[in-house]
Amino acid sequence: MLPDGVVDVLFEDAHKQEVLRHQLIQQLISHGYQLVNPPMIEFTESLLSGASEDLKRQTFKIIDQLTGRLMGIRADITPQILRIDAHHGGDGIARYCYAGDVIHTLPSGLFGSRTPLQLGAEIFGCEYIAADIELIDVLFSMLNSLEMSAALHVDLGHVAIFKRLAELAVLSESDTEQLMQLYANKNLPELKQVCQALPLGSDFYTLARFGHDIANLLGRLSENAQQDAQIVTAIDELQRLKAHLQVQWQCAVSIDVTELSGYHYHTGIVFNGYINSETQPLVRGGRFDGMKSNQLATNQPRQATGFSMDVSRLLAHTQLDAPVIVLVDYDAFKDLGSEQLQLLLQQVASLRQQGYRVTMPLTAKDIPVGMTHRLSLVDNQWQLHAV
């Protein structure tokens, strides 16, 4: 019996998943991203350093039998990339990619997996929006190469707008959390009432009421907000990224500046990519801070941006070419002499190099599932024919 949210990936699905993983990683490598493969387990002081409460809850903990110290089984690979960059990233721009299993204590959503195959890419050391645009371009290049059955819809946000307003209004932690909860619940009537008692309350309400209209959002904010460089920059970044997605990738884009689910982790642009009517995003990404680098005199966090996805979520939206499954005629080869057998093995090797799946049967009843072709001996020549 398997736990809820844990499934076997079998046969053609397992083959498809591995093909997709390999194809996507090769795409990332071809764009200049360095492949890394961190371990499944780490001591929690490094694995969960600076982690959100949600990530801590999602992480299984175990006791190291060698040292007695607490270890965690990774629930997300990104914190491991932060550690790797802090030790090896230097002070220049660094690009990383990865693909590996992660394990969650709880599933994401009603039918979510607790064992995703997480694949992602990240850029460290570049504070400019050019890095976010590059990642978007890489993501769409990857997905377009798969010829997916449906188009991706992207929902953009920018946590820096709300963060800066909260700083200007000197909001307490409880007021900040209350606003975030009201935003998440889309509760405009209660939000309006709460905002009446807050400094810059009209701005916080405007984010929820008009935040989707990014072209006109700045003009609806208060004069203080309109003159704040951080808010102006954030809105400009959203407009530029939205325009790039629409022009370069003909992508449907929506804006939600009150999408703050990663508020305690993200620092700027955030995006979720959805497909069809699925409620859980296929891909998540955004800006965040790396660790303070051991190699930098300033000891400042490295700015970073990245995205990740669960490769198994792609299975339902992609198709591979139907495999050619070949069975060698058992009766024809079981009594072959060594010279004739060697010729057969050479032909089998040639077929396998061409991508055919060739089974050399052990008995007459050894027939592969889904067989499409048979390799038979006709007039002393091995010939391939469909069945």
Swiss-Prot record:
One of its GO terms (cellular component) is cytoplasm. Heteromultimer composed of HisG and HisZ subunits. The keyword Amino-acid biosynthesis applies. This function is generally fulfilled by the C-terminal part of HisG, which is missing in some bacteria such as this one. Belongs to the class-II aminoacyl-tRNA synthetase family. HisZ subfamily. Required for the first step of histidine biosynthesis. May allow the feedback regulation of ATP phosphoribosyltransferase activity by histidine. InterPro entries: aa-tRNA-synth_II/BPL/LPL, HisRS-like_core, HisRS/HisZ, HisZ. It is found in: Cytoplasm. GO terms for molecular function: histidine-tRNA ligase activity. The lineage of its organism: Bacteria, Pseudomonadati, Pseudomonadota, Gammaproteobacteria, Moraxellales. Keywords: Amino-acid biosynthesis, Cytoplasm, Histidine biosynthesis. This is ATP phosphoribosyltransferase regulatory subunit. Pfam families: tRNA-synt_His. GO terms for biological process: histidyl-tRNA aminoacylation; L-histidine biosynthetic process. Pathway: Amino-acid biosynthesis; L-histidine biosynthesis; L-histidine from 5-phospho-alpha-D-ribose 1-diphosphate: step 1/9.
